[in-house]
């Protein structure tokens, strides 16, 4: 087992599927939008819209041009990785013990990828550094959703904020099917009262309902991560695509300094090996007009 892994290998089929399942369960983006397999070399999603309405043509009348607009969004997977040092006893562990370690690693890696998907797609940041990623560029909701599609957040009327976001989306010809809110906004909704009673009791005591009206609902700290002013992302998530390329390599590195850590130094010198996992995932916003953001006002302080 150890000698095979030391040369690098792929996750066994059931572990790879487990990663997919856990990402769907812990990423709000994944919850609101099912994944589409993305080829390793990327995929081009074509968008097509008819610019006008059908036209009545009188007998012997002339037909006019309704017009159509065609575009394309290219989705190219990018690579994310996670690595950590572990005791080299992993290399001599029994198969059962090694599988147990791999399953624990699988769960942890899945959680990191899930959170990373949200942070990258919503904010366009490198999850590890928290800084804007030049690799992602403007392929994120914070960059794409602007102008009248940004609703100013009010802690006293968070439900109205969502209604206002829905109005913007509907005016663009879409029907919102999903919403994810920051925990602060979920708490504000829970605190609303009418005639001395909770207005939305399904939010009481930290509850996160599966649906809000006809929309899939979730609450996640990734929305307001770091210093972000985002409080909610609302939209028609059929206008968003994301997915994995299939390979999920797990490499066990037995020597060297693969994490470039000058303090920890060589692996063999410290009886360690290095576990590194990589995933290839991509996403694309097919039409920014299908989405709206609720944002807190910028503080003057």
Language-model-derived ranges and their functions:
Residues 39, 78, 173, 211, ...:
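A short, structural micro-pattern
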Residues 2-83, 107, 290:
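Assembly/oligomerization interface modules of large self-assembling protein complexes
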Residues 1-27, 253, 261-301:
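Protruding loop/beta-arch "assembly-hinge" segments enriched in small, turn-prone residues
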Residues 149-266:
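Extended oligomerization regions of viral-like shell subunits
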Residues 54-56, 85-86, 94-95, 188-191, ...:
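Short helix/loop capping segments that flank catalytic or ligand/cofactor-binding pockets
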Residues 51, 81, 90, 115, ...:
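Short loop/turn segments at secondary-structure transitions that flank enzyme active sites
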Residues 48-49, 87, 182-184, 220, ...:
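Structured loops at beta-to-helix junctions and adjacent beta-edge loops in soluble globular domains
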Residues 87-171, 293-294, 299-301:
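Alpha-helical scaffold segments that mediate packing/assembly in large oligomeric complexes
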């Amino acid at each position: 087992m150890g000698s095979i892994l030391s040369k690098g290998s792929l996750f066994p089929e059931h572990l790879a599927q487990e990663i997919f399942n856990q990402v769907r369960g812990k990423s709000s983006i994944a919850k609101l939008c099912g994944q589409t397999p993305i080829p390793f070399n990327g995929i081009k999603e074509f968008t097509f819209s008819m610019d006008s309405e059908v036209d009545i043509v009188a007998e012997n009348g002339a037909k006019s041009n309704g017009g159509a607009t065609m575009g394309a969004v290219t989705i190219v997977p990018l690579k994310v990785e996670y690595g950590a040092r572990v005791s080299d006893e992993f290399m001599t562990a029994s198969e059962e013990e090694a599988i147990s370690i791999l399953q624990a690693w699988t769960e942890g890696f899945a959680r990191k990828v899930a959170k990373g998907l949200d942070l990258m797609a919503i904010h366009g940041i490198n999850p590890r550094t928290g800084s804007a990623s030049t690799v992602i560029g403007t392929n994120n909701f914070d960059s794409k959703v602007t102008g009248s599609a940004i609703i100013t957040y009010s802690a006293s009327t968070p439900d109205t904020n969502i209604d206002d976001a829905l109005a913007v989306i509907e005016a663009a010809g879409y029907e919102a099917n999903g919403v994810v809110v920051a925990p602060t906004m979920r708490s504000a909704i829970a605190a609303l009262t009418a005639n001395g009673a909770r207005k939305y009791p399904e939010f009481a005591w930290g509850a996160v309902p599966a649906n809000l009206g006809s929309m899939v609902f979730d609450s996640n700290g990734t929305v307001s991560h770091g210093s972000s002013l985002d409080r909610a992302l609302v939209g028609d998530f059929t206008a968003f695509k994301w997915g994995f390329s299939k390979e999920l390599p797990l490499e066990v590195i037995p020597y060297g300094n693969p994490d470039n850590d000058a303090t920890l130094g060589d692996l063999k010198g410290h009886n360690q090996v290095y576990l590194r996992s990589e995933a290839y995932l991509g996403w694309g916003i097919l039409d920014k007009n299908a989405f709206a953001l609720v944002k807190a006002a910028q503080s003057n302080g």
